[in-house]
Amino acid sequence: MHNKDRLRKKYFFIRKKKYFEIKSSFFNPLIKLINKKHKERHVNLSSYYPASFEANTLKLFETGFIKKLRIFLPVLKENNAMYFHEWKKNDVLKINQFGMLEPAILSNHIVPDIMLIPLLAYDKQNNRLGYGGGFYDRYLNKY
């Protein structure tokens, strides 16, 4: 087993144990920052639909504290590309080839103002350990 695979397994186990300790207030610093920096215009926020004991971003969207917030979820394409399409609370989601939920009806894709990026861990140099697909790394390198 490669080192990254071992780390993914280790940190997934840790995240699973800590998942139920996360409170709604977890997002308060982010809410304050967004409201302070973007109070005059709409904010295009990309996120992920939570799965596998990830921080429940749905709680953030339901708070209503962020004014003029537009949510965009990733959609994965056949060529290993990822794009972000708008999603509203009652919009239909479909399961993609990796078992993740993504918008079923696609809007124009956008480059988000702010991105919430899933991760398993990060190190002292702020290197992110994701799930190994490289989608976010490719997206960030492109944009």
Residue positions per predicted region:
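Conserved phosphate- and dinucleotide-binding cores of soluble alpha/beta proteins
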Residues: 83-143
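N-terminal active-site beta-alpha-beta segment that forms phosphate/nucleotide-binding
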Residues: 1-102, 107-110
